[in-house]
């Protein structure tokens, strides 16, 4: 199957603690997670992620299987090794990727970059490349790098324990590429800016997905 990448807004979702009409559409485990969350924004994010995962699976002709978590917190379907997924959210945006091979995704809202984070977490080659950019290009480039690096660590299952600075993403040639990691040739990177949402994807497929923006409400 081709890798699917879906983006949705959480803006119109109700707080499930006030309006629980959408809760039956997500898994019992996610309902329990939502019930444990104290902040309305966190409950809406958890609900939105569950709804988007259900939508992506439905469009692929699949039902929601049970979900388990790996040692570093990566979610997976233990009964469906042929289906891999990844979820991410930022502010009022939620992103979901579904594939038949290893996949990771990340979304961030485009805004002022934080150079101190680049100094702390980016590879030296990435920092040099960023510092040479015109100021007008810096913010978008920063978030493209950040989302692609997060996506790679999610796809590998390493999470942040893998170290954002331990490998390099090269954006200089137009097509994102991985460097300084032994499995670089296995992975394909995809980056897209949709409105204010910077979306990154790392997967072991060989085709770039088309980002679909969808509504979460029935």
Language model features with spans:
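Core catalytic alpha/beta fold that binds nucleotide/phospho-ligands
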Residues: 1-218
């Amino acid at each position: 199957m081709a890798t699917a990448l879906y983006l949705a807004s959480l803006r119109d979702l109700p707080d499930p603690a006030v309006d629980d009409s959408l809760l039956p559409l997500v898994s019992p485990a996610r309902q329990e997670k939502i019930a444990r969350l104290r902040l309305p924004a966190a409950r809406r994010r958890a609900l939105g992620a569950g709804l988007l995962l259900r939508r992506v699976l439905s469009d692929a002709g699949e039902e929601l299987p049970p979900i388990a978590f790996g040692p570093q917190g990566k979610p997976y379907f233990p009964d469906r090794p042929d289906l891999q997924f990844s979820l991410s959210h930022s502010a009022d945006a939620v992103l979901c990727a579904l594939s038949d091979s290893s996949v990771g995704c990340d979304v961030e809202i485009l805004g002022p970059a934080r150079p101190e984070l680049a100094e702390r977490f980016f590879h030296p080659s990435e920092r040099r490349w960023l510092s040479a950019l015109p100021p007008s290009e810096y913010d978008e480039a920063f978030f493209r790098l950040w989302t692609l690096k997060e996506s790679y660590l999610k796809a590998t299952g390493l999470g942040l324990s893998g170290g954002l600075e331990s490998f390099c993403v090269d954006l200089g040639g137009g097509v994102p590429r991985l460097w300084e990691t032994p499995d670089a040739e296995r992975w394909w990177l995809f980056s897209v800016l949709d409105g204010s949402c910077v979306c990154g994807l790392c997967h072991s497929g060989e085709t770039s997905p088309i980002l679909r923006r969808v509504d979460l409400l029935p």
